[in-house]
Amino acid sequence: MASEFKKKLFWRAVVAEFLAMTLFVFISIGSALGFKYPVGNNQTAVQDNVKVSLAFGLSIATLAQSVGHISGAHLNPAVTLGLLLSCQISIFRALMYIIAQCVGAIVATAILSGITSSLPGNSLGRNDLADGVNSGQGLGIEIIGTLQLVLCVLATTDRRRRDLGGSAPLAIGLSVALGHLLAIDYTGCGINPARSFGSAVITHNFSNHWIFWVGPFIGGALAVLIYDFILAPRSSDFTDRVKVWTSGQVEEYDLDADDINSRVEMKPK
C-alpha cells in the first residue's frame, strides 16, 4: 500500500477514475432524463430503451479508450471488486477507485440536477423497482446484468490470451448496453453501484438502494469465480496471487504457452 500511495501515477489513476466517472454519469444519465424511472405498467418504448442503452454503452466504450491506459478505466465499483478478487489490483487501489467513482457520480448528478431542474418528473436516473417487480427479482436482474459485464471485462482484458482481436473498450461498452437492454424495464438498470449511489444521494431517496450494491457485487464476484476458477483457471498458487492485494497492481506479465490452444498462465515479473 505504501508503495502505491507515494506514486504520482497512482494518484493520476485515481483522478482519471473520478473525471471519467463524472463524464460517464453526466452523459449517460443526461440521455435518460425525460423518461421516468422506475417504469410503471406502461413500460418505456423500445426506441427509448435502445437510446438509453446505447448512451450508456457508447460512453463507457469512449471513456475506457480515453483513460484505460491511465487507470484501467474501471468506472464501476463492481468491476473494481471483480479485479480485486481476481488478484489484479491492491485493496488500497480498489478502495480509492470506489471512492473516486462514487464522488464522480455525485458531482455529475448534482450538475445534472441544476441543469435539468425544470424537467417534470425528473428522477435524475434513480434506480428503483418497476411496478410488479419484487426485491428478489430485482436483485436477480442486477446480479445477471453485472455478471455478464464483469465476465466480459475479465475475458477481454486477460493478458494471457493470444487470440484477442478488435477493441476491448468497444466489447465492454456493448456489454454495458446489453445489460441495460435487459434490466431497464425491471430496475432502471443499475449494474453500477456508484452510478446508482449518485442519483440516490442527490434525490435523497434510498428506496431499495441496497439492491444496487448487493446485486452488482454478487454478480461481479460470481464472474470472477466462473472465469478464474472454471473457464480459464490459473495455475499459479492462490496464496501467491493474493500478495497483489498488499503489494500493489500487477503491471507486467510473462506469457507461458506452447500454442494458442494451450492454457496460458499470468505470472508477475
UniProtKB/Swiss-Prot annotation:
Residues 30-46, 110-133, 182-186, 200-206 are extracellular. This is Aquaporin-1. The lineage of its organism: Eukaryota, Metazoa, Chordata, Craniata, Vertebrata. It catalyses: H2O(in) = H2O(out); nitric oxide(out) = nitric oxide(in); CO2(out) = CO2(in); glycerol(in) = glycerol(out). A motif (NPA 1) lies at residues 76-78. Residues 1-11, 66-68, 83-90, 154-163, 225-269 are cytoplasmic. Belongs to the MIP/aquaporin (TC 1.A.8) family. Gene3D superfamilies: Glycerol uptake facilitator protein. CDD domains: MIP. Pfam families: MIP.
